[in-house]
Amino acid sequence: MEAKWFAREYEAGDESAIGALWRAAFPDDDEVGRTELEYWNWQYRDPPAGFARIRVAVADDRIVGHYAVIPVYMQVRGQVVLGSLSLNTMTHPDCQRQGILTKLASEVYDELGRAGLPITYGFPNENSVGALTKTLGWHYVCALRVYVKPLHADVIADRVLPGGLVRSMAKPLAQLGAALIGRSSSVPEPARNNMRWLERFSSDADELWQAVYNRSKIALTRNADFLNWRYPQNPLRGYRILAYEEQGQLVAYAVLRCMEQFGLRGGMIVDLVGHPTRDDALATVLAAAEEYFRQEDMDLAACLMHGDRRTVQSLRRSGFLPAPGRAFKEWHFCVRLNDSSTDADCIADADRWYVTFGDTDVI
């Protein structure tokens, strides 16, 4: 029997009910703290581009559906645009297949169009892609490539290979291949004096981003305000910021996180930015990141990098290769136009986009 529900805007005081919905919708989520008020405030209230747009569905005095986007500053072919990231979409298990999310999402998109936020992007799971593109006007852009470097060859082989006789026969070769690919990189001794752990980003991150940003691309604006909110201000996740500096100026950086990912202990390079004329600095940052991950006993290092060929080349030179097929999570990237101010062909063009793990909300 379908519950009688109605849609409305988020209201102050809904936070605990939204948390209860999260626990019902995602009972296997093991990231402790995602439903706490401090994290909710950080994710929805405190983004530097403004408060989230949230719609909820209510039935029997409880919240049974939730659709939200957070505003983000983007650069679209050189122009600053206020866009949005779709995240934390959920329906209570008792209220599936009642059109709740279609209703909530459509209302949010209408509001975004009226408010002048033309672009919404997101990373739906494979089961959601069809519904988004067929009924809600989304464009499928591409599957994003993750680059990985094995740090523990035996663990990688156990995870990737099938069981039984096939594993026993193939594992030695797989271990050898992973060991050869995953040879250690080391920081050049003269460059160690340039490496720093940062507590926060300063204005030189803005200058570095403007040097890196290709005006033909679409990308989130990686200025200090955004980076500090996204990483050091996150109350739940322990990011580390590794920087290469010269004469007090930021030349390259990587944001790192150690976590369980793909069924392995993953050293995640969440963001990776280097000055376009300083491949040496970027290589040094990658080597220092690998050293840190090995110290933390990670099984592999992983970096999602799309839209920057130079950085991909640096990853490959450092021993990173594309993750093999479905052995790891696939990242589907989709976008939606909420008004007619932006060219649909432009935003749906995979070659236009610059994307890293830092553009998601889950890494």
Predicted regions and their residues:
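A short helix-loop-beta-strand connector motif used in the catalytic cores of GNAT acetyltransferases and
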Residues: 43-56, 60, 65, 133, ...
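Tryptophan-centric aromatic hotspots in well-structured domains and transmembrane helices
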Residues: 37-44, 67-69, 101, 138, ...
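Conserved beta-strand in the GNAT
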Residues: 54-56, 62-72, 85, 90, ...
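Short amphipathic alpha-helix that is part of the acyltransferase structural core
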Residues: 1-63, 81-85, 158-225, 266-267, ...
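Oxyanion-binding "anion nests"
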Residues: 215-243
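Conserved acetyl-CoA binding element of GNAT-fold acetyltransferases
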Residues: 80-93, 264-276
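Active-site/acyl-donor-binding loops of N-acyltransferases
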Residues: 2, 118-179, 230-233, 240, ...
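Conserved acetyl-CoA-binding loop-helix of GNAT-fold acetyltransferases
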Residues: 91, 96-111, 279-291
